[in-house]
Amino acid sequence: MNLIFRCLVLFLTMMGSEVIFASSGVGNTLDFGELAAFPGAEGYGSMTTGGRGGKVYIVTSLADNGLPGTLRYGIEKLDGPRTIIFQVSGTIFLLKDLKIRKGDLTIAGQTAPGGGICIAGYPVTNYASNVILRFLRFRMGNKECVHPDGADALGGKGAKNVIIDHCSVSWCTDECASFYENDDFTMQWCIISESLRLGGHTKGPHGYGGIWGGEHSSYHHN
């Protein structure tokens, strides 16, 4: 096979398609073996498939009203495997906590034009399995979010097969990024910084990088 054809076959396979060759009237499936979540994925969460083979949902609005075209709609309303890509760039100011409860999800922040995507104002928490988050900025802050005991800018627990890659997480009132009680989890090549020590926590001065743990969890190059 020439190089172009090899690349096409690899692309179709990564998209979840079965590639079949005709040989003497018999179909043969080309098997590449198990594929990583994406090139460069490492650690226990590296084989997460996310939304591979499913629908593609395009974010066309920075609003947080939950209508079609918003990030919240793609996360909370759609079912089944899905990959979320962005036609817009800028900051999504959340109106309330954003909770990921439906798995088989990829959020590809690298698809946003310009300066990319920032998610601000409230916590983002993952409770779903088989989730890929890439190239996103999380800036919770303490202006809109009222959590007396503090809140994590990005967090999650109780999930399996999760990988977070090339994200930056800052401005929390508890921990910036806390992930525990997960299995087959990776957080890699992320910036975790600038917790708000005087952010309004009931304990007084309080603000930390994160609580990390779980079974088969990898934290590297952060």
What is each PLM-predicted segment?
Residues M1-R6:
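Positively charged n-region of N-terminal signal peptides that target proteins for export
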Residues C7-E18:
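Bacterial N-terminal signal peptides
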Residues F21-G27:
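Boundary at the C-terminal end of the N-terminal hydrophobic targeting segment
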Residues A36-I84:
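Acidic Gly/Asp/Thr-rich repetitive segments characteristic of extracellular carbohydrate-active
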Residues A63-N65, R82, S89-T91, T111-G114:
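Acidic glycine-/aspartate-rich tracts in secreted/extracellular proteins
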Residues L71-G80, I92-A108, G115-F135, M140-K160, ...:
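Extracellular beta-strand-rich solenoid/capping regions of secreted or surface-exposed proteins
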Residues D104, A108-G109, S129-N142, G158-W171, ...:
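Right-handed parallel beta-helix
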Residues A151, D174-C176, G207:
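Conserved positions at the start
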